[in-house]
């Protein structure tokens, strides 16, 4: 199969196949704290490790418009810290709850009934009982060009 971004419907595919082609994809459950001390927790399917020396991870924030910032990105850019929580099977339902579009400042930990655990080296809490949590310091935000067809 030859894949051309945003031309999937012309090929008879109901959805863009990129997410299915690059698999399995881990879910990065990103916890962040805003400069107003509000806590945010949201899952990101475009998350991965970039390097082990230096240790670096990334998550991709996709928005409807260039002017709209997701709470996670806003918080990470304001405070420079975030936690990547690795989602286990026991957290699937809570992760789905945290993916809802809550107003800025609403704490998804509370909505999803999750335990907040203090991190060791940063001010952002992590999710209790996840298989792993990566305490991170923001290095750089890259703004990628948007596809003219909306992707």
Where are these regions (language model features)?
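Active-site-proximal mixed secondary-structure blocks
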Residues: 1-40, 48-151
